């Protein structure tokens, strides 16, 4: 079966791209390894920021439901859930594995919206059961309705660490502390204030020293860090927890992009190795587009906009829409994107995207 | 430092602890004339992030529409009726309504509250300050649940007047949601 666009990853970026392309006449296949479309949105119970006209104030789970319903109602989109993309081949085909077996599908263009994976942290005892990534804790609680334990140490005060701490409390689980290695809280102040007034201490310049327990986590030792992020002996504190939740950042999931031979570059501000792509989200391999965390760690509002830009660019590339209409609509989306990124808290990602832009211009010039 | 807001740091505490400082809160305190006229919204929003639902939620034009989505909200307190729409709308749960005219001894505080079970009318609740310290008791005046089940409920609490700018969270006595912290 040949499709005009194959989207790998049914999260906010992939679904937004699939919809935008299909609405402009492109025949699309969406592949996702989960049974349900939506990516991380299916467990995000907090209300989104951004513009009211674009889902601000709406909870992630609801945004995911709206995207999923729209995709399933779109006749030009074929959805393959429970299906994993195993590899990309130079004849523009993709090896996929679904419950019914392994097969190949061919696409004129591709959108890799494969998301991110969580970063691990090194400390003694980090292999004990009870040490979780924040994504797993969120899945257990918000998708399956299972409490991960009774008492938690959260490591990392980015938005994920803060939001998951809040959700743990909503589920009736104690959060003993949130430790943050940096001198400042990483996430939004409103999220921090929200968990602080529930009585959860946020300890900056602190980290986990070690986890205790014979067969599973029975406690943890935290300590203060000096300016070089080394633990200060004598500042250790033992805390009574059975869960250690790591919210220590994400790194783009680029395996398929590497394998497809897309040029990659290391951009620390975007979380690690990312593909090099232009303002239309197209990589240096013509016809291969990227969006979402795979293109740089950010958040779902910007991921959805990048997905839309990619979907629109695919439609233009395939000749489905006239150039001037594409440019007009693309510029509106690009302006929204740069407005979302224009605040003081986005300075890091702005630096990252400037690096990519400079690389693209350098190669063209 | 003892202040109108209780025992809070004087400044520079927000980004290192999550606790707004006296300086932060002084910057968003409604003027005396607004506090004397009735219920009024207090926007405890101190950091420029891309977010605008409060401006959209206000039916009275008190919270100005955003020209840049990253702006901090600007409120015209004399137009604010204290209706509480913005409390439920704020994605950051950073808006409260305070009515210091409720009675000679008591004030009303409207707080976003996303915990179940929701308290019942007239139920006694425990009140906490911005650092999560227990600061007193209040009684539930009313609970506004919102249109759908995903909306943020707003709980209006009668509290001692001295807590009008101190209490910013509530819990049920012996609630499972609060045990341990």
Which positions does each model-derived feature cover?
Chain A
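Residues forming the flavin
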Residues: 1-365
């Amino acid at each position: 079966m040949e499709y005009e666009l194959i989207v790998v990853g049914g999260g906010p970026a992939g679904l937004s791209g699939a919809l935008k392309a299909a609405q402009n006449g492109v025949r699309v296949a969406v592949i996702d390894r989960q049974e349900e479309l939506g990516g991380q949105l299916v467990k995000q119970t907090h209300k989104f920021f951004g513009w009211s006209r674009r889902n601000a104030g709406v909870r992630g789970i609801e945004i995911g439901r709206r995207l999923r319903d729209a995709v399933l109602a779109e006749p030009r989109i074929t959805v393959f859930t429970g299906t994993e993309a195993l590899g990309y081949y130079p004849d523009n085909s993709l090896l996929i594995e679904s419950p019914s077996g392994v097969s190949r599908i061919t696409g004129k263009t591709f959108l890799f919206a494969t998301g991110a994976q969580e970063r691990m942290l090194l400390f003694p005892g980090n292999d004990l059961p009870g040490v979780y990534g924040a994504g797993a804790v969120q899945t257990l609680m918000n998708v399956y309705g299972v409490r991960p334990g009774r008492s938690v140490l959260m490591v990392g005060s980015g938005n994920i660490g803060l939001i998951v701490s809040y959700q743990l409390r909503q589920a009736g689980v104690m959060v003993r502390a949130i430790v943050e290695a940096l001198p400042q809280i990483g996430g939004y102040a409103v999220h921090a204030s929200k968990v602080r007034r529930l009585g959860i201490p946020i300890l900056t310049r602190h980290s986990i020293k070690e986890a205790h327990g014979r067969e599973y986590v029975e406690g943890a030792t935290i300590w203060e860090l000096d300016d070089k992020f080394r633990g200060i002996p004598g500042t250790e504190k033992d805390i009574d927890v059975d869960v250690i939740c790591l919210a220590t950042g994400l790194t783009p999931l680029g395996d398929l992009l590497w394998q497809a031979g897309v040029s990659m570059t290391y951009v620390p501000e975007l979380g690690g190795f990312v593909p090099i792509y232009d303002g239309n989200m197209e990589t240096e391999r013509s016809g291969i587009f990227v969006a979402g965390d795979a293109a740089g760690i950010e958040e779902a509002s910007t991921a959805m906009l990048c997905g839309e830009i990619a979907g629109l660019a695919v439609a233009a590339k395939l000749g489905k829409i006239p150039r001037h209409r594409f440019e007009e609509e693309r510029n509106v989306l690009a302006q929204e994107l740069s407005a979302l990124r224009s605040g003081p808290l986005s300075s890091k990602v702005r630096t990252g995207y400037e690096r990519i832009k400079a690389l693209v211009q350098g190669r063209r010039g | 430092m003892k202040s109108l807001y209780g025992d809070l740091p004087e400044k520079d505490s927000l980004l290192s602890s999550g606790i707004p400082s006296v300086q932060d809160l002084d910057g968003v305190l409604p003027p005396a004339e607004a506090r004397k006229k009735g219920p009024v919204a207090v926007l405890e929003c101190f950091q420029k992030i891309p977010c605008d639902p409060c401006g959209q939620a206000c039916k009275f034009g008190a919270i100005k529409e955003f020209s840049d989505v990253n702006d901090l909200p600007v409120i015209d307190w004399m137009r604010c009726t204290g209706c509480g729409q913005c409390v439920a709308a704020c994605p950051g749960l950073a808006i409260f309504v305070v009515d210091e005219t409720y009675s000679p001894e008591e004030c009303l505080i409207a707080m976003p509250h996303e915990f179940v079970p929701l308290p019942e009318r007239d139920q006694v609740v425990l009140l906490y300050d911005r650092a999560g310290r227990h600061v007193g008791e209040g009684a539930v005046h009313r609970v506004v649940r919102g249109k759908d089940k995903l909306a943020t409920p707003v709980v209006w609490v009668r509290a001692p007047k001295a807590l009008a700018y101190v209490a910013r969270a509530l819990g049920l006595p012996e609630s499972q949601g609060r045990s341990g912290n």
